[in-house]
């Protein structure tokens, strides 16, 4: 029996972009473009006759913008939506607004300046469509800003790192991809300020992680920042790996620090959860908790297995609460996972582990 193709509707106001996207997707035998639309009104009429498996949607269009249309889709008949737009850091607020509204993923419009760039961006687009077709679509509620963060502490810069500042003996490392931007909100927003230091690899384009960290920081009791080379890992802080660079955990004497490195993609990603997890296995051992969350592919599975072999506690998000049960599934299959938990259990698991775990010797 032939495998059913993934049916895609393309919505973009540019005829040339619709043609390029259609050509790229048609090259994959698993994908079928069932139609195109020049704006959301045309798309809405098509949806009355046939519902696709995935909608590929631009944001900036005449008559109705993509985010407004996305909200209507989520309210009327939720369908996995991939945003395909000209990504710029200046437009990051729109990107995160789309994710909060229910978009599964965001990909840049294919680059045609070089053959290599076209191949890479085309592959990323097709991968996003396949990932979205497997996604569980869940409309999101609007996020609230934590008022207590908007005090003098938001104006006065923190003290310079020094020996008087606390260090953390326990480290949490998280690897996450598709569906992760909203899942991370759910985890971080309920963690108390005395939680362990947290290092996070979220697959995200270069230039967007600083804005993502800023948005998380506004909605959480803990502090969230884009990681920088040499950052000390402190309790009550979460560090987001910068886009297109690897993040590692290292030690400097008795202190944990962050190292940011260039290098080729690992497990097809940069930053890579495998890189973070392997460094945590090496430098933190039994003092680390490794968590793998929603996402497609197998990034993080091997690194998490190495963490477990060296004494770390390891968890995976369960299938029911994942947008895409790919990365956790691979980690479970290879024996890397000690416990499977739902998304809303992850914060409790972190704090229970911190309270129960006696740190191993730093020697």
From Swiss-Prot:
<feature type="active site">
    <location>
        <position position="299"/>
    </location>
</feature>
<dbReference type="GO" id="GO:0050568">
    <property type="term" value="F:protein-glutamine glutaminase activity"/>
</dbReference>
<dbReference type="GO" id="GO:0006935">
    <property type="term" value="P:chemotaxis"/>
</dbReference>
<protein>
    <recommendedName>
        <fullName>Protein-glutamate methylesterase/protein-glutamine glutaminase of group 3 operon</fullName>
        <ecNumber>3.1.1.61</ecNumber>
        <ecNumber>3.5.1.44</ecNumber>
    </recommendedName>
</protein>
<feature type="active site">
    <location>
        <position position="177"/>
    </location>
</feature>
<dbReference type="InterPro" id="IPR008248">
    <property type="entry name" value="CheB-like"/>
</dbReference>
<dbReference type="Pfam" id="PF00072">
    <property type="entry name" value="Response_reg"/>
</dbReference>
<keyword id="KW-0597">Phosphoprotein</keyword>
<comment type="function">
    <text>Involved in chemotaxis. Part of a chemotaxis signal transduction system that modulates chemotaxis in response to various stimuli. Catalyzes the demethylation of specific methylglutamate residues introduced into the chemoreceptors (methyl-accepting chemotaxis proteins or MCP) by CheR. Also mediates the irreversible deamidation of specific glutamine residues to glutamic acid.</text>
</comment>
<dbReference type="GO" id="GO:0000156">
    <property type="term" value="F:phosphorelay response regulator activity"/>
</dbReference>
<feature type="active site">
    <location>
        <position position="203"/>
    </location>
</feature>
<dbReference type="InterPro" id="IPR000673">
    <property type="entry name" value="Sig_transdc_resp-reg_Me-estase"/>
</dbReference>
<comment type="similarity">
    <text>Belongs to the CheB family.</text>
</comment>
<feature type="domain" description="CheB-type methylesterase">
    <location>
        <begin position="166"/>
        <end position="357"/>
    </location>
</feature>
<keyword id="KW-0963">Cytoplasm</keyword>
<dbReference type="InterPro" id="IPR035909">
    <property type="entry name" value="CheB_C"/>
</dbReference>
<dbReference type="InterPro" id="IPR011006">
    <property type="entry name" value="CheY-like_superfamily"/>
</dbReference>
<keyword id="KW-0145">Chemotaxis</keyword>
<dbReference type="GO" id="GO:0008984">
    <property type="term" value="F:protein-glutamate methylesterase activity"/>
</dbReference>
<dbReference type="Pfam" id="PF01339">
    <property type="entry name" value="CheB_methylest"/>
</dbReference>
<keyword id="KW-0378">Hydrolase</keyword>
<feature type="modified residue" description="4-aspartylphosphate">
    <location>
        <position position="58"/>
    </location>
</feature>
<dbReference type="GO" id="GO:0005737">
    <property type="term" value="C:cytoplasm"/>
</dbReference>
<feature type="domain" description="Response regulatory">
    <location>
        <begin position="7"/>
        <end position="124"/>
    </location>
</feature>
<dbReference type="InterPro" id="IPR001789">
    <property type="entry name" value="Sig_transdc_resp-reg_receiver"/>
</dbReference>
């Amino acid at each position: 029996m032939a495998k059913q193709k993934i049916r895609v509707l393309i919505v973009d106001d540019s005829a040339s972009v619709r043609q390029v996207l259609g050509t790229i997707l048609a090259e994959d035998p698993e994908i079928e473009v069932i139609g195109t639309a020049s704006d959301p009104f045309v798309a809405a009429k098509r949806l009355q006759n046939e519902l696709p498996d995935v909608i590929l949607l631009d944001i900036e269009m005449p008559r109705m913008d993509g985010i407004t249309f996305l909200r209507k889709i989520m309210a009327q008949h939720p369908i996995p939506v991939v945003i395909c737009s000209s990504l710029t850091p200046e437009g990051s607020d729109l990107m995160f607004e789309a994710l909060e509204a229910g978009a599964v993923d965001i990909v840049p419009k294919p680059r045609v300046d070089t053959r290599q760039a076209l191949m890479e961006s085309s592959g990323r687009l097709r991968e996003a469509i396949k990932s979205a077709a497997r996604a569980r679509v869940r409309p999101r509620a609007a996020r609230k800003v934590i008022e207590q963060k908007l005090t003098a502490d938001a104006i006065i810069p923190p003290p310079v790192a020094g020996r008087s500042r606390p260090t953390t003996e326990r480290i949490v490392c998280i690897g996450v991809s598709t569906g992760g931007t909203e899942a991370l909100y759910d985890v971080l927003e309920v963690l108390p300020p005395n939680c362990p230091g947290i290092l996070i690899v979220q697959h995200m384009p270069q230039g967007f992680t600083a804005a993502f960290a800023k948005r998380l920081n506004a909605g959480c009791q803990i502090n969230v920042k884009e990681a920088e080379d040499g950052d000390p890992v402190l309790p009550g802080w979460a560090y987001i790996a910068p886009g297109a660079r690897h993040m590692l955990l290292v030690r400097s004497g008795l202190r944990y620090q962050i190292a940011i490195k260039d290098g080729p993609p690992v497990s097809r990603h940069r930053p890579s959860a495998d890189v973070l997890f392997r460094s945590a296995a090496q430098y933190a051992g039994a003092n680390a908790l490794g968590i793998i969350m929603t996402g497609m592919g197998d990034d993080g599975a091997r690194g998490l297995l190495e963490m477990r072999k060296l004494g770390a506690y390891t968890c995976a998000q369960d299938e029911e609460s994942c947008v895409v049960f790919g990365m956790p599934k691979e980690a479970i299959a290879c024996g890397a996972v000690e416990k499977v938990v739902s998304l809303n259990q992850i914060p409790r698991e972190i704090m229970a582990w911190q309270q129960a775990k006696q740190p191993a010797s730093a020697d």
